[in-house]
Swiss-Prot record:
Pfam families associated with the record: ODAM
Source species: Bos taurus (Bovine)
Organism lineage string: Eukaryota, Metazoa, Chordata, Craniata, Vertebrata
Glycosylation (residues): T115, T208, T248, T271
Signal peptide from the UniProt entry: 1-15
Subcellular compartments: Secreted; Cytoplasm; Nucleus
Positions of region (Disordered): 103-124
Keywords annotated in UniProt: Biomineralization, Cytoplasm, Glycoprotein, Nucleus, Secreted, Signal
Protein name: Odontogenic ameloblast-associated protein
GO CC, alphabetical: cell periphery; cytoplasm; cytosol; extracellular space; mitotic spindle; nucleoplasm; nucleus; supramolecular fiber
Described function: Tooth-associated epithelia protein that probably plays a role in odontogenesis, the complex process that results in the initiation and generation of the tooth. May be incorporated in the enamel matrix at the end of mineralization process. Involved in the induction of RHOA activity via interaction with ARHGEF and expression of downstream factors such as ROCK. Plays a role in attachment of the junctional epithelium to the tooth surface.
Length: 277
């Protein structure tokens, strides 16, 4: 299929004229048959490659040769055909130049030396070549970057400074959530400790809470407290005493100096003995 297309393009380029011709409209199509050069009819000259295929029209050429303007040198048919093969629809007469449109016709100065026009012969010697290579500008335009991709000079530098090694307490500060400041303490998974160092577990019936030892002192010092005993004397049920004089011996025996307690008891015994009748 590609070879057929290449052969068709090759044939079209070989049959096309190599000399650019003026584009004629439909109203000026009669100028192909009738050329306004001294009111003489001219034969229809085909394009360059077809001149060797069709014989010339002898009747029109004889009439044209008889009606030549006197004073001009006769021009042979072979030379005229050769000129017609070079430039279609144009015949060069010595001392006179005619155009296919017939609008411009001027007399050349015989004193000036006439240089013969160098025109290309038919496509017999020149082989047309067809290039299918894409231009370099179009190939460069196809290279584009997507929107989400960074250009080489826009990529951020990924050099991150290594932070110094952190201790366990600093890592615990970073991992601690913000709601610990409001009193809620989540249950942290701690490593297994020996039996001697294990902390007591929270007992909901007795109301004992273990001390938080893993929390650093600078984060929340108010949370580090000693073990609090919420146990009441009657196992969680508070019953007020009905006696008028509360007994203070239970609370002061452990915290008061025993020497002071002796003096107080002696004074109390004296006052009791004085009050009795």
């Amino acid at each position: 299929m590609r070879t057929l297309i290449l052969l068709g393009i090759l044939g079209a380029t070989m049959s096309a004229p190599l000399i650019p011709q003026h584009l004629m409209s439909a109203s000026n199509s009669n100028e192909l048959l009738l050329n306004l050069n001294n009111a003489q009819l001219r034969p229809l000259q085909l394009q360059g490659p077809f001149n060797s295929w069709f014989p010339p029209f002898p009747g029109i050429l004889q009439q044209q040769q008889q009606n030549q303007v006197p004073g001009l040198s006769p021009f042979s048919l072979s030379t005229r055909e050769w000129f017609a093969g070079l430039v279609p629809n144009q015949i060069f007469v010595p001392g006179q130049v005619s155009f296919a449109q017939g609008t411009q016709a001027g007399q050349l100065d015989p004193s000036q030396p006439q240089t013969p026009q160098q025109t290309q012969r038919g496509p017999k010697n020149v082989m047309p070549s067809v290039f299918f290579k894409m231009p370099q500008e179009q190939a460069q335009m196809l290279q584009y970057y997507p929107v989400y991709m960074f250009l080489p000079w826009e990529q951020p530098q990924q050099t991150v400074a290594q932070s110094p090694p952190q201790t366990r307490e600093q890592l615990f500060e970073k991992q601690m959530p913000f709601y610990t400041e409001f009193g809620y303490i989540p249950q942290q998974v701690e490593p297994v400790m020996p039996v001697e160092q294990q902390q007591p577990v929270f007992d909901p019936f007795l109301g004992t809470a273990p001390e938080i030892a893993a929390m650093p002192a600078e984060v929340s010092p108010y949370l580090q407290k000693e073990m609090i005993n919420f146990q009441h004397t009657n196992a969680g049920i508070f019953i007020p005493s009905t006696s008028q004089k509360p007994s203070t011996t239970i609370f002061f025996t452990s915290a008061v100096d025993p020497i002071i307690t002796r003096e107080l008891t002696e004074k109390k015994a004296k006052t009791d003995s004085l009050k009795e009748p």
